[in-house]
Amino acid sequence: MEKSKVSSESLIGRESELRHLHMAVRNRQSQLIWGPGDAGKTFLIARMLAELPEGERRKCICWAGPASRRELLEHVIRGLYFAGDPLVHEKVRADRFTEANLARWIDKQSALRLRGILFTATERGEYRLFLDHLSPVSHAITELLKQIVYRAKTPVYLTGRGCSQAEIGSAWSLYWTDEYRIHLGPMPENAARELVEICIRRFGLDSLDLGGFREDLLHLSGHLPGSIVKMCELAAEPRYHYGDQVKMRLLHVDYLLQGKRFSSPSSYAS
């Protein structure tokens, strides 16, 4: 999962959500982390993972982007192998394969056998699965996720831009109540302003004439941390300067166009 170029400061105003996610991970409770684009869903997960002990982090299997049922199943098996799962290693060795040709071994297996290995390997309840930018989730993948959650005893942490069927597909049935949801909305006013000041320093914008820049940025970003960071990063580029002023209208249009490109089915948004 890709991390933002602004480090821990991007988590300003998200401390409560981070605690909630840590608690859910400790309790092995599946969660939907939902909110608009650039609300910080990817960064929240990355920050939480970075704070886990190394042993626990190795057993967190992460996927980003769209996937078919088969692709997701193969990725989980691959994740179990690299997490050092003894059963998966035993199966690979028994078929006279190694890490060097693991992909070929996985490709040769039927979906039925891969599911059997997955369920047996995870029955001790040691792993966690994080899925970013997968939505909307098809019925077939939802059925696999339900098997992973209920049969394989493995919690699934999913990101989405909403919590309804229209936004995350059939997966809504896994996260049907607020108990299984973490909502990331706009940041509080004071936190958003603090992040703006940090980004101004980080991207060297304090040498520009920022009259009106802060208020325009807060308004156009909707107090979303990813929007603040990305627009400040763009503001550092000379093409958005008119003398020592920032051309906010052009910058905002380009930021929106970037967002549309990154949210297309073939790319990974942040």
What residues fall within each predicted segment?
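Conserved NTP-binding/hydrolysis module of P-loop NTPases
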Residues: 2-5, 69-98
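N-terminal pre-P-loop "Q-motif" helix
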Residues: 8-21
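Walker A/P-loop nucleotide-binding motif
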Residues: 28-46
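C-terminal alpha-helical "lid" subdomain
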Residues: 32, 44, 128, 185, ...
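Sensor-1/coupling segment of RecA-like P-loop NTPase cores
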Residues: 35, 130-174, 178
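Conserved catalytic segments around the Walker B and adjacent sensor/switch elements
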Residues: 52-67
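Mid-core helix/loop region of P-loop NTP-binding domains shared across ATPases and GTPases
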Residues: 85-144, 148, 208-220, 227-228
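Conserved AAA+ ATPase core "coupling" helix
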Residues: 171-200
